[in-house]
Amino acid sequence: MGAVPGVVLLLMLAVLGIRAAPAPEECHKLTKPVLKADVQNVSGDWVLVWSVANTTERWICENLTSSYVEFKLHSDIIEYTERNLFLGNSCISFYSNLSASTEKQQQFSLNNLQMEEKGVVRPFNDNGTVKFFETCVDCLSMEYSGDIGRFLLIYRRDGVHQNVEVLKAARDESQKLAECLGFSIDEPFIYDGVSDFCHKKSPEECHKLTKPVTKADVQSVSGDWVLVWSVAENISTSNEWTKLKSSHVELRIHSGVIVLNERNMLKNNSCMTFKTNMTAGPESQNTFIYTSGKMEENGVDKELDENGTVKFFETCADCLSIDYSGLFGHVLFVYRRDGVHQNVEVLKAAQDESQKLAECLGFSIGEPFIYDGVSDFCHKKSSPEVKPEQD
């Protein structure tokens, strides 16, 4: 019998639900790795939306309902936190540092991998390596290879992970990448778009509150801001800078760089000033990074070799919220634009919304800082003095 014409073969494959294997040139495009020199692009918070594994450790894949990953850059190290929620609301977290030697290296090694389950942290002995692939805007793919097997993990940036139709349309591309990397497609994990995470919820209300400001729209954060509400985690209460009376922040945009000048007045009327520059990668990126800063206290300048990440949220007109993660811990700052920061009743009414945002971001609400509406700032009074009328 003669050869089956190509068109007929394609029609047969379509009827049978079988997809042709991706062409080599398509694989070359899909498997372009992220180098160490460009690793800033992976920084941020990510939600697992699709995954396939060739492993003997099936417990890692079975009964998974959600997986949330944070990548934080610290000098040449990527700090990696993965939180996995399983059926029955049990959580297993993994912590590690990823490193690569040269700027052109595309493979990252895992160091000091640890697993936490039911509050108990123990070493997880697996010699693993990771490769990253950027397959679309706000997408990240990660190939993990170790003693326990191989995993392909497809992520969407937190905040754009809930559109089920978009995720469904992207599955074919995910399967192509898996085939290009030599994975056998068995029963992939597929995120349902609504399941919560170990450390925070993923409801529609949170989706609205936690819509981040991207680099393309960062001009909107420019201006002078007054801190009106704040909550912190993993932070030492003995730090003097936590004993706030008022905090005034100036944000200026210069060619894509955010210049921050923060003046904190403490309860003993001493002042502490912090200055830094923040940058982001692509226009769509919503995580801003700084690698150094300068702190001034009692007239003494101190260089801070600190790596931190910041996300901005615009929750209302003349409002700005900042989610900070870094050396000082994890802090949510809620601001009002200078000039509309003194109406105590309005600020009090907005506290419930601030608390909702904090809960959506995974904060446990302890004793928040609440601005009293009248305290002065380091460099100026909270409101201009009223001059007496002239006769």
UniProtKB/Swiss-Prot annotation:
Sequence repeats lie at residues 24-202, 203-391. The gene is psbp2. Glycosylated. It comes from the Eukaryota. Homodimer or heterodimer of PSTBP1 and PSTBP2. Gene3D superfamilies: 2.40.128.20. This is Saxitoxin and tetrodotoxin-binding protein 2. CDD domains: lipocalin_ApoM_AGP. PANTHER family: ALPHA-1-ACID GLYCOPROTEIN, ALPHA-1-ACID GLYCOPROTEIN 1. Its main location: secreted. It is found in: Secreted. Binds both saxitoxin and tetradotoxin. May play a role in toxin accumulation and/or excretion. Keywords: Glycoprotein, Repeat, Secreted, Signal. Glycans are attached at N41, N54, N63, N97, N234, N268, N277, N307. GO terms for cellular component: extracellular region. Residues 1-20 form the signal peptide.
